Amino acid sequence: MGRKSKKIIVALALLSGISFFLFARADEEEKYVRLVKAQSVNIITDADGKAFRKAVDATFLHNGTLLICDTAYWRVDENIINAKGNVRLSQEGTELTSEKLDYYVNDNLAQFRGGVVQLRDKENNILRTHFLDYNTADSVAVFSKGASMKDKDGQIIESLDGTYSSKAKLFTFEKDVNMFTDSVFIKTQALDYHTDSQKAVFRTYIDFWKDDNMLTASSGWYERNDEIFFFTGDVHGITDKQETWCDSLYFYRIPNNVLMKGSIQLQDSLHNTTAVSRYLFYEDSLSTVTLRKEAAVAIVT
């Protein structure tokens, strides 16, 4: 083996050793919480004789997450931080604020209870609740007992339970879900909201209201950027003059047009008309209905 080959092998071995050291050091750092700065730190003993550190104007670092508060009581033996006053938890664009939290270092868990906690993500969506757990290792929040999320455009989604994943850019809402967007109100039991695409996915049965119009369906979605609603599965729509049934329906909100597909039935009490087809398109600007594919119309006189 030549001298040049030996040098390459030695260099690779050194690089491997350095890489292993860096990864090992990163893993080691994640295990420990650091007090980055504080105005003052005092060691205090409680009634049970256990010592803890009291830090004023404290900033902690753990899992790449900053924990900032007015006062922190750090129970070192149990590895728990009780933070109080202007509490802020910040991690890669996700920020949680409240008046208090308990941080369980060994579990990577920030636990908010009782007071209002606000979660703001990179897209400036704001969620408020009273019961929330945030895992700093996987960047996932779990909330319960009621929450409300408002996006940057004013759209509101409410539910009893749910989750938020910073990495997936995803809110999930479960149980008694209500969605308010301008003049539209939707009620369901399970909704996923993708913050990067501003798309809401309704995973269970839907009740939809717009002005005096009502619609029900098995599932669907809403793309806010394009202002398109899609409903599928036993779609049933009711207006003051019409009633419709179909397999799937697209509602184009800006032009206020409607496209129906599948097994379509239309009953129009204003014109005493009944129609069936496999395709129906309603164009609002012209107030016209176009029927295609196995279309038939009956007029009651």
State the predicted function of each range:
Residues 23-301:
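N-terminal amphipathic/hydrophobic interface segments
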Residues 1-30:
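Bacterial Sec-dependent N-terminal signal peptides
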